[in-house]
């Protein structure tokens, strides 16, 4: 299998080591009943809404993860951060900036209407300090807010272009919380 490519010219996947059939079987029925197995392997073939549905399903299975020694964790769950990175990158337009951090202040302000009652800049900087439920709420909100948009906006340049890497760093601690 080829390595994951993170450019708009090349489809993302397959992710080495990820058992796509097992991933498909692990997704909640609300997701798996509305997608095909090839949809998981090629984010370019699905709509924005389907990408969001798949990402929500991945957050669900990350939240309900088995022990790290379980075969399911080894074949599926440990690959979820990289898988989400690829799908979110395609959802946002394929231009991905792995080398820079999101603008925490701008992102914090963007989250105020939905998560302002509890989110702090400290949580955004250190996602491992959030509870399992808080991480899930943040990931769900990112998916809800995500959309392909013009690349010439401040929000795109400072937040969304860098979001796939940030999302990956947030979902990772979720896999290790009980």
Swiss-Prot record:
The keyword Lipid biosynthesis does not apply. It comes from the Viruses. GO terms for cellular component: host cell cytoplasm. The keyword Manganese does not apply. Pfam families: Tenui_NCP. Its main location: host cell. Keywords: Host cytoplasm. Signal peptide: none annotated. It is found in: Host cytoplasm. Induces the formation of large intracellular inclusion body, organized in amorphous and crystalline arrays. Presumably the main cause of the stripe disease observed in host. Belongs to the tenuiviruses NCP family. This is Major non-capsid protein.
């Amino acid at each position: 299998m080829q390595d994951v490519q993170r450019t708009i010219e090349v489809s993302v996947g397959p992710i080495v080591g990820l058992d796509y059939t097992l991933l498909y079987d692990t997704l909640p029925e609300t997701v798996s009943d509305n997608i095909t197995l090839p949809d998981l392997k090629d984010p370019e073939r699905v709509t924005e809404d389907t990408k969001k549905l798949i990402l929500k399903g991945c957050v669900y299975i990350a939240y309900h993860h088995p022990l790290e020694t379980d075969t399911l964790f080894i074949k599926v769950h440990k690959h979820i951060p990289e898988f989400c990175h690829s799908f979110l990158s395609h959802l946002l337009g394929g231009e991905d900036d792995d080398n820079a951090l999101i603008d925490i202040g701008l992102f914090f302000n963007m989250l105020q209407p939905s998560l302002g009652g509890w989110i702090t800049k400290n949580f955004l900087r250190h996602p491992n300090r959030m509870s399992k439920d808080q991480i899930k709420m943040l990931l769900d909100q990112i998916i809800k807010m995500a959309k392909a948009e013009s690349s010439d906006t401040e929000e795109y340049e400072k937040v969304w272009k860098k979001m796939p890497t940030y999302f990956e760093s947030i979902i990772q601690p979720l896999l290790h919380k009980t």
